[in-house]
Amino acid sequence: MENSLKSSGKPLAAPKVGMVSLGCPKALVDSEQIITQLRAEGYEISGTYDGADLVVVNTCGFIDEAVQESLDAIGEALAENGKVIVTGCLGAKKSASGSGLIAEVHPKVLAVTGPHAVGEVMQAVHSHLPKPHDPFVDLVPAAGIKLTPRHYAYLKISEGCNHRCSFCIIPSMRGELVSRPVAEVMLEAENLFKSGVKELLVISQDTSAYGVDVKYRTGFWNGRPLKTRMTELVGALGELAAQYGAWVRLHYVYPYPHVDEIIPMMAQGPLKGHVLPYLDVPFQHAHPEVLKRMKRPANAERVLERVQKWREICPDLTIRSTFIAGFPGETDAQFETLLDFIRDAELDRVGCFAYSPVEGASANALDGALPDDVREARRARFMEVAEEVSAARIARKIGKTLKVLIDEVNAEGGIGRTAADAPEIDGVVYVEPAAKASKRYKVGEFVSVKITGADSHDLWGEV
């Protein structure tokens, strides 16, 4: 999420806190939890720097560009406001000297915490901006304070990760996997649906590993036992979504064997149309030698077989993935294997990063580092092939009538998304204005749209 605080406005006497949220959806959920707690304690949220008594900056520290963006945002907040508390992944990052990076670059910050640290952030806020005496807890909705539009929300089911991928430093910043109690997750989901959310995006560092840390302990929801495991959680969320006519979308699904159990829920039975036929699976590469150096599962042939089997069971399945091109030691032949994989798997939506060393990642010690121009050329070539595959798949939708969730309405019509499109990262559907009053649509509504055109990313249609 971009920094949305701007300079202007008048100073306000009430205790107000500004919030800058950077990074991934997991960080966004952390920001929402902080804002919810602030509101619960009677603080108000300011949309400007100079309208705030204090600013909290939630940072990202995954890649060098994100680190710099976070450091710049902290600097801007210090310049515009002066009282800044920093939280998030960058807070856990050390500098070359071994001290905290943020404190070294920006020594004037009031406090620094790591990610998923609502309690520590609130302690820092209390120290520098004492809370009001009479908090109005009833002013905070049961669903909490959200930074997303009212009709969709992220549901974080766990924190941390047990994997040790050589290119990643997330575990060193967010720690080992910690799964939320299943009843707590279900209660949050229910409150979100009750508040009008029509699409719930399930996120974590590793959604498929949900419950591993508690040995799939059995919890209880609505008086019945419910195992703390991805399969059972998705089934329960799908049942809940069906009651509200809503969608559940799965992100960060590591391809464990039990993911196969989810596909039939998407394809048939009462959960069809509610557990969306959509999987965000971070494959990262397809050649076994590269995957081995990445410390990722290395059976690409088996993965391709599974993808093809998933599509047999659920022909409408959309698969999104992310890849790294130019990883240390990647040969021309290994890169071609990667291109063959995305063609054969017919991946619908893909993103690709040119490999970039991340401070603290074990991949930095690998031999065979490739020049910047080679890495970037491979990324560009990868995206050319990926767009060809995507364009071919998306063209098949022309002439079909699809269910679309409207995100925006303007003078030119509407902008929405199908079951195949997650917000912000996938394509959209441009919907023509309704010709009749009976067909007019609003933000947050589902409408049936006949698809009339497509490119490699987006669709066009009419109600």
Swiss-Prot record:
One of its GO terms (biological process) is tRNA modification. [4Fe-4S] cluster 1 binds at C24, C60, C89. It holds the Pfam family Radical_SAM. Residues 395-463 form the TRAM domain. Its main location: cytoplasm. Binds 2 [4Fe-4S] clusters. One cluster is coordinated with 3 cysteines and an exchangeable S-adenosyl-L-methionine. GO terms for molecular function: 4 iron, 4 sulfur cluster binding; aspartic acid methylthiotransferase activity; metal ion binding; protein methylthiotransferase activity. Disulfide bonds: none annotated. Gene3D superfamilies: Methylthiotransferase, N-terminal domain, Nucleic acid-binding proteins, tm_1862 like domain. Belongs to the methylthiotransferase family. RimO subfamily. This is Ribosomal protein uS12 methylthiotransferase RimO. The lineage of its organism: Bacteria, Pseudomonadati, Pseudomonadota, Betaproteobacteria, Burkholderiales. The gene is rimO.
